[in-house]
Design a protein with these regions (language model features):
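Single conserved hydrophobic/aromatic residue that forms the stacking wall/gate
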Residues: 1-11
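Compositional signal for N-terminal targeting/processing segments
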Residues: 9, 17, 138-147, 159-167, ...
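Short conserved micro-motifs at the rims of enzyme active sites and ligand-binding pockets
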Residues: 14, 114-116, 228-233
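Short alpha-helix boundary/capping and kink motifs at helix termini
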Residues: 22-181
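Glycine-rich, charged/polar anion/phosphate-binding loops
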Residues: 85-89, 203-204, 255-259, 266
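Residues that flank catalytic or metal-binding motifs in active/ligand-binding sites
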Residues: 99, 214-216, 268
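Catalytic or ion-translocation cores adjacent to nucleophile or general acid/base/metal-coordination motifs
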Residues: 184-251
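C-terminal catalytic or substrate-handling cores of phosphate/nucleotide-
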Residues: 237-276
Length: 276
């Protein structure tokens, strides 16, 4: 996203008009190659790893940032709702859809993105270039063939099925299926949802069915991709009793089936370092 389309959260009021003006300029003079479908994206990092993704539209009717609501597209973290209104001011009246949102698909069999990657030489390349500040290289190809689009949609349907969910997550506390999880940009997607909910109040059911604001731009990546590295977030606790903390963590983990403490099937062991 060009820096002219980015605003600081601290001084967003001062930059809204400039952002909207820059969007108008880009819409008229830069973004002239339309794609009727998806865009297959490859980002080559400095390490040589290639992150593959599909850029498309997320149906906001299938997403909610409110805890407990049934939806097939869900956030991976709690949403701080106070961060939504400033973003709504930028999105309201914007002529371009330019959020940075990464969705994650739990696709160990590589049925969604990788088959498209294997056929990229058949696709029309729509952009390519170097990214700033050592960000690597990026290229995008248009996925417009109806057969390939149907293939993507079918893969998403299977990934979001109840059968697939039950097979992957037999110990999950909530049983409604999950198609995509928000990996990054949760508050941007939440803002799109909030804007859509406000706008939908002014529309007839027929208008709401196909209104452009119902969808939000996002990139979908496979969480099993070798280029997706999920780093731990370390926490330091001061002036606590190590044994008490350990017991509390084990109790919480077992009660929530989090699998983050100890036991034969626990997948995320951790270390408590401190005086014993």
């Amino acid at each position: 996203i060009p820096l002219r389309l980015v605003g600081s959260e601290m001084c967003i009021r001062d930059s809204i008009e400039k952002i909207h003006a820059a969007m108008d300029d880009y819409a008229q003079n830069v973004l002239t190659r339309a794609v009727d479908g998806f865009i297959y994206v490859e980002r080559t990092e400095q390490s040589g790893k290639v992150r593959q993704g599909l850029v498309g539209m997320v149906d906001l009717e299938a997403y909610s940032y409110r805890r407990g609501e049934k939806c097939t597209v869900r956030p991976s973290e709690s949403t701080v709702e106070s961060r939504i209104p400033p973003r709504m001011k930028v999105r309201t009246g914007a002529t371009l859809e330019t959020p940075h949102i990464m969705m994650l698909a739990d696709d160990p069999q590589c049925t969604l993105i990788e088959p498209i990657a294997a056929r990229k030489n058949e696709l029309r390349k729509v952009y390519e270039g170097e990214l700033m500040l050592g960000g690597g290289h990026v290229a995008g190809w248009a996925v417009e063939d109806p057969a390939l689009i149907a293939q993507i949609e079918n893969a998403l349907t299977v990934l979001g099925s109840q059968e697939e969910f039950d097979k992957k997550y037999p110990d999950a506390t909530r049983r409604d299926p999950l198609t995509l999880a928000v990996g990054d940009g949760n508050h941007s997607l939440a803002t799109a949802k909030a804007c859509w909910e406000e706008l939908k109040k002014t529309l007839t059911p027929e208008q709401a069915e196909n209104h452009p604001a119902r969808w939000c731009l996002a990139e979908v990546c496979n969480v099993h991709s070798p280029a997706i590295e999920i780093e731990p977030i370390h926490r330091v606790l001061f002036n606590v009793d190590c044994a008490t903390v350990l017991l509390s963590l084990i109790t919480w983990s077992d009660a929530n089936m989090a699998g983050c403490c100890f036991g034969g099937n626990k997948k995320q062991p951790f270390t408590l370092a401190g005086p014993h």
